[in-house]
Amino acid sequence: MDSVVVSLPMSGDEAVRLDSRFGKLWAASTVSALGSGLATVAAPLFVAARTGNPLAVSAAAAVAWLPWLLFALPGGVLVDRVDRRRLMIAVDSTRVAAMGVLATAILTGRDSIALLYVVLFVVNTGEIVLRSASQAMVADVVPPGRLERANGWIIGGATTAEFMLAGPLAGFLFRVGNGLPFLANAATYAASAILIGWIAGRFRPAVREGLIVPAGDGAARTSGLRSVWSDLAEGFSWLVRQRLLRTMAVLIGLLNITLTGAMAVLVLLARQRLGLGSVGYGALFACLAAGGILGSVIGDRLIARVSATWTLRIGLLVEAALHLTLATSHSRYVVGFALFAFGVHGTLWTIVANSLRQRLTPPAMLGRVGSTNLFIAAGGNCAGALLAGGVASTFGITAPYWAGFVVAVAVCVTTWRVFSRSAMAQAYAGSPAEAAAGLADGADSPAT
């Protein structure tokens, strides 16, 4: 019998409960995020313990994001062609093996920074597929009226695990033994694979009934009959025609350059300016997570109250404020609060972005459209990680944060009117095909 994950007194499909299928997907996402968070914190600590070179530290972040540039797009095609549940199990199993090798090497004294880079590359290649498949499965098991709440739960669970729990835990485990965070990471991926295996049903888009193919994009296709490039072009061209989704994708790619750059050298800022050790550095991520948790709890109600338009606009201001704080403050408490506020913004932004994409995108294209967004975001992540080390080495540790502030202010000024109330209202109304058609280039949507 399906267990209840959450229920609110709503009408229509908004009153439908999120059942045990979503509960298992949420649990898998959360436990996997815990493991990924352990590696995210432990990797720069591992490199910094062996070399104080900012380039080597930021390179760990760059290597982690490089697979997103190489494999995000074909990964989306794969998600749209095969059973998403089975694919996620296979990927998690591969990640267990990779992290197990790294943990064993560190614990036996046979480690190297090069091996860490290789494992990060493999694990994050799998993360691409898992992220796209998981987002698509949310749309499979959750009715449209509950997407904001479901995405809030997914983001809240992942944020709690990856930052609130993983940060301090990784710092503690690293002090006990450098290989322990990576060993624990392998165990979480194994648990995730088991949980996904318990989800009932088939999740291959081509065999589901009610497959939606947008007008003008060709007749319904059979998986495998078209080339990967044709599938990629179909998903990309559809996204390009959707003004709102296209703008959000480009915007997050640009902002990720400065944000990832800021986070790539945060370990050095924490040590040199804030006087924090490994546990204190992890606590900064806990502040970020606390904000994310608050955002996930109040997200669907806050977005409904203040509107998606102002949720996004205020979030852009918060982003600018974060960079300014990191550039000027010497107080660990002020920095912690800034990260907390950014955590709230980050969760609210992601809820809006994911829910809009799941609403507007035809089911058979969710993998490709989602992976295209991930590719654009990853481009910014990788560029930011690569640039931050060089900028910090040349101009000082605060230089990446000043650059981030300037970019964030410029983005606020140039995109303020894009997220109008009329565009958002149209996106939340009607069927996915109708809403997407209304928001395509050429459709009337006055900015307000």
Predicted regions and their residues:
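Alpha-helical transmembrane-bundle signature of multi-pass membrane transport and export proteins
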Residues: 1-448
